[in-house]
Amino acid sequence: METMPNWLKQRAFLTPDRTAIEIEEEKVTFMQLHEKVVSVCEHLTHVGVNRGQKVAVLMKNGMEMITVIHALSYVGAVAVLLNTRLSREELLWQMDDAEVICLVTDQDFEAKDIPVYSFAEVMNGPKEEASIQEEFSLREAMTIIYTSGTTGKPKGVILTYGNHWASAVGSSLNLGLRDDDCWLACMPMFHVGGLSLLMKNIMYGMRILLVPKYDADFIHKALQTRGVTIISVVSKMLTDLLERLGEGTYPSSFRCMLLGGGPAPKPLLETCVDKGIPVYQTYGMTETSSQICTLSADYMLTKVGSAGKPLFQCQLRIEKDGVVVPPFAEGEIVVKGPNVTGGYFNREDATRETIQNGWLHTGDLGYLDEEGFLYVLDRRSDLIISGGENIYPAQIEEVLLSHPMVAEAGVVGMTDDKWGQVPAAFVVKSGEITEEEILHFCEEKLAKYKVPKKACFLEELPRNASKKLLRRELRQLVEEM
């Protein structure tokens, strides 16, 4: 199969009156969404957007962003999705790197070298008949999303129509589909996790309740009253929701809490079991079009810390020095599947280094147990090497989070004259606790060389728009000490 019918157009034909998107009190059917997208196409065509061009999108979650993303696929342009939290300089660099022909935005932004189109101004301007793709070629690029740049400059990950299709199919085979499914979308759509929900929305014909920005109070209420069956979260969001739930429970129709961004502490999972909240832990990245592994809720306590097994059409193995290692041996996580990117835009060297014989070398460290369950230890770039010993920040963070007075924790390496590196901890308190008490608590639960040499208190930890911990900012704080 090399082509498919235009996804949204086909969905509007099959189920025109079914609700596609809910935002606050607004409801839009698939046919209404299609009509909105055609209108956006006609306005974008007038300003010169054509097939094969790359168009930057700098917008917040909302109906406008949804219609722009679909409109670019309708005309055959590639959407370069930009993170709204980046600085102007970072955004200009990414647009230059991606060779975009213009920027479409809902924000105030100026750029000397490329046209900047305000969405509102474009929609108030003239229309021109658009050439709409009736079919999508699965090999063609649909989106470019930049990696966070944990090592060096960010790289533009090219994701094809085929990658997005395979990701949605793999997720449905994993989680199943129900007629009444509604996915609450609170992740930014400029991240692959948020974008993937737009793909599932039109492929499954599934209703999405879109939250323009993260609001724990609204989300908690929506889970109780809006018929939500699935939500994607990270540990911080899950903690926020459990705090609001208190002694209560969510409706029995709520069937899946899809947890990404790293393993959750066991006490958190035990609370979810007590309250009947099915947590599916996942592992994925931009390069895999969202999740590539999932741990079923059936195993959430018996396989604590595991990200599960690969999706049906995907493969995973652990390598060290180019050799596949046996169970429990630590090494680099290497993955393969139709949802995996073919490479980075204008980065041939990085593509060759990362993707070898179809296998993507993730840069993450982990191991498989005897049953093939994946355990992610850490980013290779986050590894702390102290006196020749490997220390995984995630392990120390798990210990810190098990203390009742610790709400959030982040660990990074700091330079040490004797050991090369030693761990340093950053903590957000949920009650009264001293640095000495934290370090003593760690001494009781960790090998001596893993105990943080310093614990600093912050009002909040630095996180990205998906609420993932930004270790690089913690490393900067360490350097400033």
From Swiss-Prot:
Transmembrane segments: none
Molecular function terms, GO-annotated: ATP binding; o-succinylbenzoate-CoA ligase activity
PROSITE patterns assigned: AMP_BINDING
One biological process term in Gene Ontology: menaquinone biosynthetic process
Pathway the protein takes part in: Quinol/quinone metabolism; 1,4-dihydroxy-2-naphthoate biosynthesis; 1,4-dihydroxy-2-naphthoate from chorismate: step 5/7; Quinol/quinone metabolism; menaquinone biosynthesis
Enzyme nomenclature, EC number: 6.2.1.26
Keywords for this protein: ATP-binding, Ligase, Menaquinone biosynthesis, Nucleotide-binding
Reaction catalyzed: 2-succinylbenzoate + ATP + CoA = 2-succinylbenzoyl-CoA + AMP + diphosphate
Family: Belongs to the ATP-dependent AMP-binding enzyme family. MenE subfamily.
HAMAP family, A to Z: MenE
Stated role: Converts 2-succinylbenzoate (OSB) to 2-succinylbenzoyl-CoA (OSB-CoA).
Protein name: 2-succinylbenzoate--CoA ligase
Taxon lineage: Bacteria, Bacillati, Bacillota, Bacilli, Bacillales
